[in-house]
């Protein structure tokens, strides 16, 4: 027997339903913020100017992975984003003419970086934790909203 009013669908906070359009919007905002942190670095507090770009880059990676894999868990996204970000950073230890030529290009430098820094790994961790934390909070709020009478 079917019912006219089925139980409302509940969301599992471990597997949030990500809206790719929203994530794309946030992705673009983070890119703009990252570029602005470089452009306006001289007038920003030194700690922001020094670390915001790398922190926002990792948040952008987290959001990008969320767009690509909207049904994966938040933890999975964080682990994959961290692995990708750390791999890019450790790749900066390797120097060959072909990859250094790519790094000299503005876009290549933004994506691949130019030199290995331990502080970048800390920034990546913070950026991904920000994404993880915001998505976890959002998922719980959304689940509570959908489960309320």
Task: Show where each model-derived region lies.
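Bulky hydrophobic segments
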Residues: 2-142
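Short, highly charged, low-complexity non-transmembrane loops/tails of multi-pass membrane proteins
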Residues: 142-149
């Amino acid at each position: 027997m079917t019912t006219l009013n089925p139980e409302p669908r509940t969301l599992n906070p471990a597997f949030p339903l990500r809206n790719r359009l929203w994530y794309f919007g946030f992705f673009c905002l983070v890119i703009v913020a990252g570029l602005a942190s470089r452009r306006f670095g001289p007038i920003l507090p030194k700690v922001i100017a020094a670390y915001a770009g790398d922190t926002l880059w990792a948040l952008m990676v987290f959001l990008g992975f969320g767009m690509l894999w909207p049904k994966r868990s938040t933890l999975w996204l964080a682990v994959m984003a961290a692995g990708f970000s750390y791999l890019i950073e450790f790749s900066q230890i390797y120097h060959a003419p072909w990859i250094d030529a790519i790094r000299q290009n503005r876009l290549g430098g933004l994506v691949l970086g130019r030199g290995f820094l331990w502080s970048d790994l800390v920034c990546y961790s913070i950026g991904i934790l920000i994404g993880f934390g915001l998505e976890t909070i959002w998922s719980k709020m959304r689940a509570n909203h959908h489960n309320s009478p």
